[in-house]
């Protein structure tokens, strides 16, 4: 996915481990590798979490309209400029 025209709000999350809550009460944890203007996400090293059950699913593309919340699981630095 191209980096031009990306909303700066998501740039600070690149290469960071995130918890992403999806519609239908689904949750994944993984590393953000890319996104586009529709908030479609490319997530690597992804684990789907369902209660106490964890399922490694590798690299996935998440459709933007499925995303409910995105939470950083590691410190994020706000870069100016």
UniProtKB/Swiss-Prot annotation:
Protein location: Nucleus
State the superkingdom.
Answer: Eukaryota
What region holds the Sm domain? 5-76
Annotated CDD domains: Sm_G (cd01719)
Grouped into one coarse class, the protein's main location is: nucleus
Please name the GO terms that the record assigns under molecular function. RNA binding
Q: Which GO terms describe its cellular component?
A: catalytic step 2 spliceosome; P granule; precatalytic spliceosome; SMN-Sm protein complex; spliceosomal tri-snRNP complex; U1 snRNP; U12-type spliceosomal complex; U2 snRNP
Keywords, A to Z, come to: mRNA processing, mRNA splicing, Nucleus, Ribonucleoprotein, RNA-binding, Spliceosome
Keyword Nucleus among record annotations: yes
Ribonucleoprotein listed as a keyword = yes
GO biological process per UniProt: mRNA splicing, via spliceosome
Q: Which family does it belong to?
A: Belongs to the snRNP Sm proteins family.
Q: What does this protein do?
A: Probable common Sm protein, is found in U1 and U2 snRNPs and may be part of the spliceosome.
Q: What is the protein's name according to its record? A: Probable small nuclear ribonucleoprotein G
Q: What is the organism of origin for this protein?
A: Medicago sativa (Alfalfa)
